[in-house]
Swiss-Prot record:
Keyword check for Cell cycle: yes
Key words of the record: Cell cycle, Cell division, Chromosome partition, Cytoplasm
Protein name: Segregation and condensation protein B
Location(s), subcellular: Cytoplasm
Pfam families: SMC_ScpB (PF04079)
UniProt GO BP: cell division; chromosome separation; DNA replication
Keyword NAD tagged: no
Amino acid sequence: MDRTEQKSIIEGLLFVSGDEGISPEQIAKVLEIEGNEVIDILEEMQKECEGAHRGLQIVQYAKVYRFATKKEHASYYQKLIDIPTAASLSQAALETLAIVAYRQPITRTEMEEIRGVKTDKALQTLVSHLLIKEMGRAEGPGRPILYGTTKEFLDTFGLKTLDDLPPLSEENEQMNEADLFFGSLQEISK
């Protein structure tokens, strides 16, 4: 087996060993080579990963090697963590989001009439996750705020435009819009 293939296998071993890492001795047993040769290969791989074109580095902790992300990219990893997902939203927020998606622009009062309960907390959550925003004000007493979905909403749910929302058929209009919306999203993502 040549050096390139050995590096490829070691790279895979580092990946599957995860945060626990893997010792040079374990790698040597898998590849059936000497431990000193494994250390030489790991050192070569560490140098190769140091370049700016690589997002991972190979680090050694407590006699094991493992992959780690580069510290200089930490702000990007934090952005990923901060991206809202449907899983991080409560059922109330998801139901409210479905109502906004299908009925926008819509006021808080209209949402509460559809849901039958207050939507203040759900609206706060959706606005803070940048999934909905104020679209303007409705005409009429008090000029209530109108809400609509955002580009982040489309990105989060893998939609190009609002036209990609599954249509509501007449028989389904009696069903819960949130159930229809998220059931349809599951179909889209298959």
